UniProtKB/Swiss-Prot annotation:
Protein family per UniProt: Belongs to the sulfate adenylyltransferase family.
Entry keyword set: ATP-binding, Nucleotide-binding, Nucleotidyltransferase, Transferase
Gene Ontology biological process terms in this record: hydrogen sulfide biosynthetic process; sulfate assimilation
Catalytic class of the enzyme: transferase
Record-given protein name: Sulfate adenylyltransferase
A molecular function (GO) term: sulfate adenylyltransferase (ATP) activity
Upper taxonomic lineage: Archaea, Thermoproteota, Thermoprotei, Desulfurococcales, Pyrodictiaceae
Annotated catalysed reactions: sulfate + ATP + H(+) = adenosine 5'-phosphosulfate + diphosphate
């Protein structure tokens, strides 16, 4: 059976066509908050149940509970605060209990009932969510630029923000129907922000050997400089699945959600989100959602063990490498040969090779995937554009 939604019910804050027109009219008369691309994505994810059981942006009780306990105030596991930050001037005259319009690209995309307005300590947030206040950490840097106040309350979606990859996007309601239609009872979800190399493929196929289906769900949205562009990731996975997977065993769908680079906390968050899509298992790799050397390579595994009530089974798959003696991708549990035979796949080294127009060897990356990356004149996000929203 597909997994039960987190909290037991799949949230739906979308509205009927008739009500949508009424809300659109109301929005014209309401105070407006302009959203970044990341916040607009959060609105859509709340409305479509990706963030179930959340019905809106967090109130202070839940916010503090998540920061301190990694649980909502009702004790349900939740590790990343879902918050809406505003400047005092933006909500001048707005009182608790008022409705506001949430605007993206000049259009109202949702209405929100402001149930609470409260302050927050950005440094405390960084220390607890990222386990560091180092401004070199991309999540910390982004957090410190956020606004002074938080507002919490339920939202009603008027329309989804524009999605360039609409043809590749499925919402939880849709994936659940699709998984059931395929007769899948066990589904392994794979989170990624990268173009696939053979280490990823090894892990995915290992999971697929003992589940009914694989759900590949890459993040599109804000990422740090040096990460792959969204379109490169999508095209690369299309090539990999077409040439190297039984297509009836894989569902591919993009998820518009910002990377936070919060390591172990974000790994739990990624698992909860995929549980809402219907996945029963979640692949947890080496240094999941990590960046630099801020987190231990298997620190996320330890955190998962603190959440026996998560409701989705983590799959801990060790780092894969190519063994010249074995002649294939293996991991340290199944390869008896010494380090001299082992070729470890470095994401940094792969990026450098691709950036220089070199083709990585076929034991590192499939040629069809290399073709996709090299056809793009600039497959990686550059410094300034990472902060443009």
């Amino acid at each position: 059976m597909v997994s039960r939604p987190h909290g037991g019910r799949l949230v739906d804050r979308t509205v009927s066509d008739k009500r949508r027109e009424r809300l659109r009219e109301e929005a014209r008369e309401l105070p407006a908050i302009r959203l970044t691309a990341g916040l607009a994505a959060d609105v859509a994810n709340i409305a479509h149940g990706v963030y179930s059981p959340l019905e809106g942006f967090m109130l202070q009780e839940d916010y503090l509970s998540v920061l301190d306990e990694m649980r909502l105030s009702n004790d349900l596991p939740w590790t990343i605060p879902i918050i809406l930050d505003v400047d005092p001037g933006e909500i001048a005259g707005v009182r608790e209990g008022d409705d506001i319009a949430l605007v993206y690209n000049g259009k109202p995309i949702a209405l929100m009932r402001v149930e609470e307005i409260y302050g927050w300590d950005r440094k405390e947030y960084a220390a607890k969510v990222f386990k560091t206040t180092d401004p070199a950490h991309p999540g910390v840097a982004k957090t410190m630029k956020r606004k002074e106040l938080l507002i919490g309350g339920p939202i009603d979606l008027i329309e989804d923000p524009p999605e360039p990859f609409e043809r590749y996007r499925l919402w939880p309601k849709e994936t659940r129907v699709l998984f059931k239609a395929r007769g899948w009872k066990t589904i392994a979800a794979f989170q990624t922000r990268n173009v696939p190399h053979l280490g990823h493929e090894y892990v995915q196929k290992a999971a697929l050997t003992f589940t009914d289906g694989l759900f590949v769900n890459p993040l599109v949205g804000w990422k740090k400089p040096g990460d792959y562009r969204d379109e490169v990731i999508v095209e690369a996975y299309q090539a990999l699945i077409k040439h190297y997977f039984p297509v009836e065993s894989v569902v591919f769908s993009v998820l518009r959600m910002e990377m936070r680079y919060a390591g172990p906390r974000e790994a739990i968050h990624h698992a909860i989100v995929r549980k809402n899509f219907g996945a029963t298992h979640f692949i947890v790799g080496r240094d999941h959602a990590g960046v630099g050397n801020y987190y231990g390579p298997y620190e996320a595994w330890e955190l998962f063990r603190e959440f026996p009530d998560l409701g989705i089974t983590p799959l801990f798959v060790r780092e894969a490498f190519y063994c010249r003696k074995c002649g294939q991708m293996v991991n340290e549990k199944i390869c008896p040969h010494p380090e001299e035979y082992r070729v470890r796949i470095s994401g940094t080294k792969l990026r450098r090779m691709l950036l220089e127009g070199q083709r990585p060897p076929e034991y590192m990356m499939r040629p069809e995937v290399v073709d996709v990356v090299l056809k793009h004149p600039n497959p990686f996000i550059e410094g300034d554009e990472a902060f443009q929203e």
